[in-house]
Every structure is written in C-alpha cells, then in structure tokens.
C-alpha cells in the first residue's frame, strides 16, 4: 500500500509539472505578446522564476526596439539571478548594461552583475580569477554610484573579497615553505607582500621569510651560507622593527643568535686561514 501511494504521488507530481509546462508552452504558441508579458510578470512576482524566464525569453524578440525591451531583458536576467544561475545572469546583466545605459534598471543591473561574480567567487584555496573579476565589477559600481543606498553593502563585499585574495597569496607562498622549497617560498612571500602590503597576513608572511631564509642558509653548502645568513639577519631585523611584540619574536631572536654564531665562527676561521 505504501509503495502504491508513493507511486501515485510521483505520478501526480509529474502530471502537475507537465500541465504547468504545457500551460507555458501553450501560452507561447497561442497567446498574444501582451498576455505572455503579463503572465511572465505574474510568475516573476510569485517567485516562479524559471517559468517567468521562459516567457520573457519567448517574447523578447517581439519587443525589440520598444519601450518594453529593457524591462524584459532586465527581468529575465533577474530571474536567472534569483534562480542562482549566476553565470548566465552575469552574462545577461553585462549585455544589459552595455545596451541600455540610460535605462531606469541600469544601476540595479550593474549591482547584480557585480554580485553575480561575488556569489561565484570560490574559497581562497581555489583559483581566484572570478574573485578578481568580482572586485573589478564591485569597484566599478562604487565609482559610478557613490550615492547608492547599497554602497556600504558593496564596500563590505569588496573588503571580504580582498581578504580572500590576501589569504590566497599567503596560501600559495606557504605551500612552497611547507614542502621545503625555501628559495621559491621567499620569492612568493615577498611577492605577496609587494602585491598586498596591507595584508592581514603581513606578520605571518614576514616571519616565514625570516624562517625560510634561516632554513635555506642552514641547509646550504658552506660557500653560500654566509650570504644567506646575512640575508636572514636583514629580514629578521625588519620583522623585529615592525612586530616587536609578535608571538614569533623569541623564535626570530633564536634564529638571529644562531646566524650570528655561525658568522662569528666563519670570520674566525677566515682570519686563522689568513694568518
């Protein structure tokens, strides 16, 4: 009996879905443009965005060059956005803002274009190309609409995404450090600081430069150790000046002591050889 009821329910669901699709298809085939447009708006306001989008797309060509063209294009893009199809929505909003620069919807379209990329932006561990696009779009919106009532919201999005890029740069550099490729780590860490000097990871980046320099020097052949310990001391002094109260300061001081001891021994050996 239970199985019968489940099968019956499935049939009913399919039948209802089919009837709705049939209703939309029938309207597109037999309905007048104004009727289709009105029904699309009705579905839109009832939050039935897939059906609304189908109808908007069905009459889009009919209204080309009319006063309804921009509204149909905007509502269709918004349906995609509200259905979480952000990739399609971004394409449609981008097309809208280029074609309808004077539309009453253009500010909303610009904002949602930026927000599409924000919502598609992945976690910091993944490629951040989309995040960079989102930041560009968000800053374009902020620049064009400084009086918008959404300006604070978009500034918050910008800050969030910027922090994500900071984290990505840190993680990329840390990966080299973690696998023991200290020369590559030093380059990547310095590039991260150069690209994002205000990074929230600045202290950690600078400490890892010190540590990478120390490990590189410690594991180098004798002919390269002096120069590498000197480079380590330079980075350690910079770290100490900027972060004198850091949780890493004791470790940095320890590495500096070891480096100085090595340099002192090396100097004495060199002096003895001269004598």
Task: Outline where the language-model segments fall.
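Acidic, polar-rich low-complexity tracts and alpha-helical solenoid repeat scaffolds
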Residues: 2-6, 17-275
